[in-house]
Curated annotation (Swiss-Prot):
Species name: Saccharomyces cerevisiae (strain ATCC 204508 / S288c) (Baker's yeast)
Gene that encodes it: SPT8
Keywords recorded for this protein, A-Z: Nucleus, Phosphoprotein, Repeat, Transcription, Transcription regulation, WD repeat
Repeat (WD) residue spans along the chain: 173-212, 305-346, 415-454, 506-544, 560-600
Protein name: SAGA complex subunit SPT8
Skewed-composition ranges (Acidic residues): 14-23, 36-75, 378-395
Phosphothreonine: residues carrying this PTM: T85
Amino acid sequence: MDEVDDILINNQVVDDEEDDEEMLSGLENDSKQDLEGNDDGGEDEEDDDDDDEDDDDDEDEREDDDEQEDDDGEDDAARMDKTATPTNEHQHDEQKAAAAGAGGAGDSGDAVTKIGSEDVKLSDVDGGVGSREASSSTHEASANGEVYEYYKHMLNAAQIADSYNIYPTAAIPIQTHVNALAVSRGLKYLFLGGSDGYIRKYDLLNTLEGKLSLTILQKHSLAESIQNAGILQSYWENEIPQKKSEMKLSANKTDYEPKVSPVHSLEVQSECLFILSGLQNGGITMQGVRYMEGSIAHYFKGRNGHTQIVNILRLNGQEDRFLSGSWDKRLLEWDLQTGDIVNEFKKSRSELSSLEMRPLYSSVDVSGNVNSGKENENADDDMDSLFGDEDEDEKQDAGNEPVETGDGSNGEENKEQISEESLNIVYDESVFMTSGLNGSVHIWDRRMTQSPALSLERGAGVPPWCLSACWGVDGDHVYAGRRNACVEQFDLKMPSKPIHNLKLPSISGPVSCVKAMPNNKHLLCASRDNIRLYNVEIAVDASNSTTKSSKVPFLIVPGHHGGIISNLYLDPTSRFIISTSGNRGWQGNSTDTTLIYDIDLE
């Protein structure tokens, strides 16, 4: 064993000596290379510098990698802390208590917890979503408020204008009679109903902005100012609901042929949640617009519903009830919540042709109207409820709530003229007016459903015909278009006969539509040849023999010519007018064109 140990020790000594010799030889070689590098003039120094730069770059890359790993480590630690924080409720409560006791959570009083290496407010972590929702709702409310203020400003400007310059800018060619129109909130969509049985939806805003132009052939017969075309978005049938036994099924027994009715009336909810459409069989359909477009959600018919064409539909301000008029001489009020008839206004003596709610702020005196009512043999003996008699509140229908009548004595002074929710004109919904084909014009009170509150009889020599009637902006006057090219003006203070007769040129034909302008001085009168903007004051002076004026009482609005005007729509700000052409199921021809006009205030 001793010999073996001596051999191992000697081998170890020999190995150590060999290592020392190799080290000495390496040092000698290095010194020789240094001397040779100095003799070469520093050529190798440049190589060494390059090597040093490469080494520096490598070191920088390693440092960046180390920093990235440190950041990843911190992120992982933060995620682990965040994950661990909600799971350990006891530690979470201790952290909140410690943070609250240490610094009072800053000036704002919010508790602070430490997540990872950062101090975060618990209110920011827990309530971030709620704060974002609150800020978005606040922003939306402020935007709606700005639009509402703009609408009021434009309406006030239109009310004090001396005159209006009306000119057409857009046209929608439709090869059918357009009997009805409806416009959604903020002029977003335009709905047109035709005698071909289709409801068409147009993008009205982009149409007004001129996003689509008419073709050369379409411009050929139109005024030069008309350049824009209507942007059609969709269309669908005005379908009449059928029983399963009455359906005509196809060969595969899965499809059926729909029964389509001409569209005689339309009324859309302000947010386009639904649209009401009148049918030829006396029914009324509620159809989806924003959701399930064109599908029928409800069918208003019932045993006591209309039996003939429904040509009038009007939603109330709350959009929970609507009025319907028909060729069966009946005027009904429906509840959208239950789908039932809540009121029937009786003793309507003719097919209804138009219906309008009364404007706010009527200045009619109570005693003056009562006296005039006694002198009028054709009017009702009791007219007090029309002008706010409190004793009539007990006689109102059980389904109705008491409503202010709209005269100044009933506290209507503070009511805004435009609704902030729907951006539509606010009316006095307790009083409305209807016109009939026999020439009758009736004033109705919602609390008197047994008969009209007032009946405005036509003047001597006027034929029994009236397609359209409208209120004056003041709520005291009514204008009725007649067949013999004239418009009769009625005053509620003297309802027994018309106070003025505004005559149009005899060649103009019957007056098919009238619309009062917001300054209470001008009236739009649509007849077969043209649309005229009448100055009522000048027209009255011209008709008076003692104060006869040489001024022409009207201006011709360019665009329309040679057809029956079925509707005139004036937007709440009085910036635009929409006219449709159609005979509404009666006599007359159509121009097959819907025109959109711009209004400039003067």
